[in-house]
Amino acid sequence: MIKSELVQKIAEANPHLYQRDVENIVNAILEQVASALERGDRVELRGFGAFSVKKRDARVGRNPRTGKQVDVSEKTVPYFKTGKEMRERLNTGK
């Protein structure tokens, strides 16, 4: 599912809301999550999961085309851990 499909599904489930307003709300939520992650904060949506950032150490990699060693610098990457309720829902098929 892509963002526009998510907006459409939410708008269909809430006919009292305009699709444009739903899109603005979804964008605002995503912006707040991104801003929190930028600051290094953890974002927990209880029952769904938690977004956080992790540091990935610098390492020596390999160029798959040439086989040459390449230095890969340290970087910060987003991380998502599913919540208990979401894992249970996925495993029971509900």
Swiss-Prot record:
The lineage of its organism: Bacteria, Pseudomonadati, Pseudomonadota, Alphaproteobacteria, Hyphomicrobiales. NCBIfam families: hip, PRK00199.1. It comes from Xanthobacter autotrophicus (strain ATCC BAA-1158 / Py2). Heterodimer of an alpha and a beta chain. Gene3D superfamilies: IHF-like DNA-binding proteins (4.10.520.10). One of its GO terms (biological process) is regulation of translation. SUPFAM superfamilies: IHF-like DNA-binding proteins. This protein is one of the two subunits of integration host factor, a specific DNA-binding protein that functions in genetic recombination as well as in transcriptional and translational control. The keyword Lipid metabolism does not apply. The gene is ihfB. Belongs to the bacterial histone-like protein family. Disulfide bonds: none annotated. One of its GO terms (molecular function) is structural constituent of chromatin. It holds the Pfam family Bac_DNA_binding. It comes from the Bacteria. Keywords: DNA recombination, DNA-binding, Transcription, Transcription regulation, Translation regulation. GO terms for cellular component: chromosome; cytosol. This is Integration host factor subunit beta. The keyword Aminoacyl-tRNA synthetase does not apply.
